[in-house]
C-alpha cells in the first residue's frame, strides 16, 4: 500500500472491517513490520519442522531408514531441534516483511487500476483469481531471489553434513565452497545462490497458488460456512483468515513438494543440475516418492506457519497498531 499522505486515491482499496466503509490504506512500513513480526513468530516456533525436513531430504534412502522418530533420536539435546533458528528467523522475518509489502503494493496497484475494493474480512484488495496467482508469483520471485543467500545459510546450518558452529563460519564455508571433507573448491559469491532456480521453482508457484487459494477460501467459501451469529466480530475474522491460510498452504505445499526435495539436495551436494538431481532422486530406493520426502513435515510446518503468519499480519494491519503515531505521517505533519 502507498503512503496515505502522498497518495489519497489508494485509500479506497482498504475498508474498515467493522463498518464495511472505505478506510485508510496502511503505510508500507506497517506492512513491512507486520509481515516481519508475523514471519519471525512462525519461524522460531516451527523451526524443528524445518530442521527435521532438511535432515530427511539430505539422506539417501538406500543407506538410511527415513523416519522422523529416527532423526529425533539422533539428537543429543532437545535444543538441537532449533539449530539454524537464527538464519531461519532472519530469512523468514525479512522475507515475510518484504513479501507482504511487495504483495500489498502490487495488489493495491492492480485493484486501483481496476477500481476494486477490499473484502469484508480483509484490508487487502479483492482481485480476480488470475490476478491473485500472478501477484503472488511475482512478489515471491523478487523476494525469494533477494533472500537466497540467507536460505543457503539456513539449509547448511540445519543439515548435519556441515558442522558449522557460527553463522560467520557458514558464510565463509559457502563462499569458499568448502566441502564436508574440508577441501576448498571454487570461491565465489554465486555459491550463495546455489539451488536458486529450484528454490524459485518451488516458491513462486507456491506463493501464486497460495494467494489464489487463500483468497478463494476466504472470500468465496469460509465466509459462507462460518456461522452468521458471529458476523462482524473479531473472532470470526481471525477464524476465517487462519482457516483459509491453513487450507491454502496445505494444497499449495503438496503441489510444489518435488521442488523442495530437489532444492535441498542441490544445496547440500556438489551437483548443480536440476535434471541430474531429479534423476538421482528417482533412481534411489523409493523412486518418485523421494520427490515428496519430508512432505508431512513441510505440510505441517507450512499450514501452521501460514495460519500464524497471515492471522497475525492481517490482524495487525486492521488493528490500531497501523494507526499509531509512528506510522501516521498526516498526524506528524
Swiss-Prot record:
GO molecular function, one term: glycine transmembrane transporter activity
TM annotation in the entry: 32-57, 84-110, 133-158, 195-218, 240-266, 294-312
Stretch list, region Disordered: 1-25
A Pfam family assignment: Mito_carr
Chief localization: mitochondrion
GO cellular component: mitochondrial inner membrane
Protein's membrane topology: Multi-pass membrane protein
Keyword hit for Repeat: yes
Database matches in SUPFAM superfamilies: Mitochondrial carrier
Subcellular location as annotated: Mitochondrion inner membrane
Gene Ontology BP annotations: glycine import into mitochondrion
Recorded catalytic activity of this chain's protein: glycine(in) = glycine(out)
Protein family per UniProt: Belongs to the mitochondrial carrier (TC 2.A.29) family. SLC25A38 subfamily.
Function: Mitochondrial glycine transporter that imports glycine into the mitochondrial matrix. Plays an important role in providing glycine for the first enzymatic step in heme biosynthesis, the condensation of glycine with succinyl-CoA to produce 5-aminolevulinate (ALA) in the mitochondrial matrix.
Protein name: Mitochondrial glycine transporter
Organism: Scheffersomyces stipitis (strain ATCC 58785 / CBS 6054 / NBRC 10063 / NRRL Y-11545)
Amino acid at each position: 500500500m502507498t503512503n496515505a499522505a502522498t497518495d489519497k486515491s489508494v485509500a479506497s482499496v482498504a475498508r474498515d472491517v467493522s463498518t464495511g466503509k472505505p478506510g485508510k490504506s496502511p503505510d508500507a512500513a506497517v506492512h513491512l513490520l507486520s509481515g516481519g513480526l508475523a514471519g519471525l513468530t512462525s519461524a522460531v516456533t516451527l523451526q524443528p519442522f524445518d530442521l527435521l525436513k532438511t535432515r530427511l531430504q539430505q539422506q539417501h534412502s538406500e543407506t538410511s531408514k527415513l523416519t522422523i522418530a529416527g532423526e529425533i533420536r539422533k539428537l543429543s539435546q532437545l535444543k538441537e531441534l532449533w539449530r539454524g533458528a537464527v538464519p531461519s528467523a532472519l530469512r523468514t522475518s525479512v522475507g515475510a516483511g518484504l513479501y507482504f509489502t511487495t504483495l500489498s503494493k502490487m495488489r493495491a496497484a492492480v485493484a486501483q487500476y481496476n477500481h476494486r475494493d477490499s473484502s469484508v474480512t480483509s484490508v487487502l484488495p479483492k482481485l480476480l483469481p488470475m490476478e491473485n496467482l500472478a501477484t503472488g508469483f511475482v512478489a515471491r520471485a523478487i523476494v525469494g531471489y533477494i533472500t537466497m543467500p540467507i536460505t543457503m545459510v539456513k539449509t547448511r546450518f540445519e543439515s548435519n553434513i556441515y558442522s558449522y558452529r557460527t553463522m560467520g563460519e557458514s558464510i565463509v564455508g559457502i563462499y569458499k565452497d568448502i566441502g564436508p571433507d574440508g577441501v576448498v573448491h571454487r570461491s565465489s559469491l554465486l555459491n550463495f545462490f546455489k539451488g536458486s532456480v529450484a528454490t524459485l521453482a518451488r516458491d513462486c508457484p507456491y506463493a501464486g497458488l497460495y494467494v489464489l487459494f487463500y483468497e478463494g477460501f476466504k472470500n468465496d467459501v469460509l465466509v459462507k460456512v462460518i456461522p452468521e451469529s458471529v458476523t462482524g466480530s473479531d473472532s470470526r475474522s481471525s477464524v476465517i483468515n487462519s482457516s483459509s491460510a491453513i487450507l491454502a498452504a496445505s494444497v499449495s505445499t503438496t503441489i510444489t513438494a518435488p521442488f523442495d526435495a530437489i532444492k535441498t539436495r542441490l544445496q547440500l551436494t556438489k551437483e548443480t543440475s536440476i535434471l541430474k538431481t531429479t534423476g538421482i532422486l528417482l533412481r534411489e530406493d523409493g523412486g518418485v516418492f523421494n520427490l515428496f520426502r519430508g512432505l508431512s513435515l513441510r505440510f505441517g510446518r507450512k499450514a501452521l506457519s501460514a495460519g500464524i503468519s497471515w492471522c497475525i499480519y492481517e490482524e495487525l494491519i486492521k488493528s490500531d497498531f497501523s494507526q499509531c503515531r509512528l506510522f501516521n505521517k498526516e498526524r506528524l505533519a
